[in-house]
Structures are given as C-alpha cells and as structure tokens.
Amino acid sequence: MRSAFVIAFFLITCLAGAGCIGNSTPAKSTYSVGSNGVLSLSCAPETMNEVVLFSNETYTKSRVVFHTESGNVTGYLATPTVPKAAFVYAPGAGERLAGHEERMVRYASAGFAFFFIDTRGNGGETPGLPFGQQLIQQDFSKFGKGEMPQYYLSICDLVSARKLLAEKYNTPVYATGSSNGGRYAAVAAGIDPEFAGYIGISTSDWGLLDSLNEQGVSGDPIRFAASIEPGTYIGKISPRPVLMYHNATDPIIPFASGEQLFGKAGAPKNFTEFSGDHGINPEVDTLIITQRA
C-alpha cells in the first residue's frame, strides 16, 4: 500500500528528529503501550446530552453528544423501547448519517438499537483529522510525548457509546464498523472486554505495521503502529464472537486482506462473502440481523 509506505517513511523521519509538533495540553484519559504494541486505555468519564428527534410506537431516534476532554463527539441513536441487542457503529471514510437513516429504522424495527458514531475527522459534525499521513504525524508526535493521540480517543468514543447503551438498556452491545470504521471497532472490541463481540464489514489491517517491518524499522514506530492495527487485538476478542463480511471483488480493500485479518481471530468466528461493492449494504444488514436474532 503506497499510503502505508508514505506514513511509514514519516515515522522513521520523525523518530530521527524532524521536529514533529503536538498538542501540549495534557490529556485526561491515559494509555500505555507494551513492548508488543498492545494498547491499554483508561478513558476519562464523559458527560453527554441526548435530544429526541423523533419517536413513534416502533422506535425513537435521538442525537447524542458526548462532551469529551478534547471536544464534542456526536452520535445518532435509533432504538426500540427495549432492544434485545445494540450495535455501536463506526462508519467508513466519509460516510454520513444520511446514508444510514433507513438502516437505523430497519434495525430498530427488528428489535435492535443502532448507534451511529460520527468518528473524529470523518467530515461530519465531529471535528478532527481523517486517518492518513497528517493524523499519523500528529498522533505519533503525541505518542512520543506521552500525550493522548486522536486515534486512541476515537477508541474511547466507541467505549463511551458502549457504556451508555449497556447502562441505559442492559443489553449486549457489539462493536461494529465498515471499512475504516471496522478497523476502529476491532481495536475497541479487543481492548474493551465488555463489548459482546465484533462485526466488521469490508475491513482489514491498516498495513502500516507490515510496511515498517518490511523496512527493518524498530522501536517506537513499531510499537505505535502495532497499537493501532486491528490485527493486534482481534485475537483477544475470543471467546466473544467475531463476524466479518467481505465482497470477493471489493475494489477498495482486497478480499484477501479481509481474510488475513479474519485468520488472526479466535473462535467463535465466521467470515461471509456478500454481493455488492464495498461497505455495509442491505444484504449485510439482513445477515447481521438474522445471525444476532
């Protein structure tokens, strides 16, 4: 992957003292990363505000804003009165709420809560940088200073969403994501044992760790790269279920890359090929709803 190589080159340069600039404000949430690159997170408590946007006999839709140490994070929740399970959903790059309105109603009608999290930097209401070279530059700088990277905060956002749903509805909550969002969700499910399981659609590792290893890099760049890779955590989800879905002709994330990540998961697990293109679609919705019913 060219993008992974470019980012890897930056990490090497940054380590050599190229003057990476980070935020000097101490973070309230804390983390540690072991020599094997495994991330441990202690997410700061967050307050939240929920405004009901629509409600009928089938479901209630609300806008939820988490007030975090680094700014507000927005999510949209659709749920029946008593959901039998819930899905914290991390969207793919550039995915907007508008593309999930019908999906939210469908899940709620089937008895499930669907919580769309507007990931930091994804171009929606929540500010931040999208995953890419600029974010890696910023986050690796913070990592080197012991400050909280945005990537880690995004994982905390998913954990906060899980806590809200679990406390409010006392129901199993699955970390779910499509494409890039599936990567964030895998890390969250591996770090937080209270997630009921993991559902990933059209997703894989980022490829950054492999790129650095191929270049013979060692030290902090490797630890940081490992700490953000889904493959570092997906094996830790067992004995909770791992469900993955991928299109054989996916034009964005190769089918083989999805299989490779799936191969690192423990049982119980299931890898399903679906029709379509890239990302979550109605066929995948049917599979998820049926398998979790």
Please identify what each model-predicted range represents:
Residues E259-A293:
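C-terminal catalytic histidine-bearing segment of alpha/beta-hydrolase fold enzymes
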Residues I237-S238, L243-H246, D250:
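Short beta-strand/loop motif that positions the catalytic acidic residue
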Residues M1-V33, V38-E50:
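Secretory targeting signatures
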Residues R106, F116-I155, D210-N213:
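Cap/lid segment of the alpha/beta-hydrolase catalytic domain
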Residues P83-K84, Y89-T126, G207-L208:
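Short substrate-entry loop that stabilizes the transition state in hydrolases
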